[in-house]
């Protein structure tokens, strides 16, 4: 089963130092999975909260599927439950509370017939760390240009 990436959160790796990642399923309605298959999803502004030992994806934009005749109107920015094992949720929650870390969505992808979300535990970068990242990226680009010509 191959993975087919639908949406990336590029800002997450720039703003956070990712320490650990997990794969989580997402609780979706039928028209939402069709929208995801049509690449009409955005997780750039999304974040993850844990309430009452359950993880939720908040502010992820999954467009309304045009051809669906769904009785309830689905809000594109609705809160969606993430499917994780209790042990995983407890481990994440413990690290968030003790080490003051943030849970960020990294990428949304299809694995077989299921939509999965890769979530990461990250520590916020300071401004000087971000500048270092930009410098490293520029150096790598210059190196690649040398080898290209």
Swiss-Prot record:
NCBIfam families: PRK05422.1, smpB. One of its GO terms (molecular function) is RNA binding. It comes from Mesoplasma florum (strain ATCC 33453 / NBRC 100688 / NCTC 11704 / L1) (Acholeplasma florum). The gene is smpB. Belongs to the SmpB family. GO terms for biological process: trans-translation. It is found in: Cytoplasm. InterPro entries: SmpB, SsrA-bd_prot, SsrA-bd_prot_CS. CDD domains: SmpB. The keyword RNA-binding applies. The keyword Signal does not apply. Required for rescue of stalled ribosomes mediated by trans-translation. Binds to transfer-messenger RNA (tmRNA), required for stable association of tmRNA with ribosomes. tmRNA and SmpB together mimic tRNA shape, replacing the anticodon stem-loop with SmpB. tmRNA is encoded by the ssrA gene; the 2 termini fold to resemble tRNA(Ala) and it encodes a 'tag peptide', a short internal open reading frame. During trans-translation Ala-aminoacylated tmRNA acts like a tRNA, entering the A-site of stalled ribosomes, displacing the stalled mRNA. Keywords: Cytoplasm, RNA-binding. Signal peptide: none annotated. This is SsrA-binding protein. PANTHER family: SSRA-BINDING PROTEIN (PTHR30308:SF2), TMRNA-BINDING COMPONENT OF TRANS-TRANSLATION TAGGING COMPLEX (PTHR30308). One of its GO terms (cellular component) is cytosol.
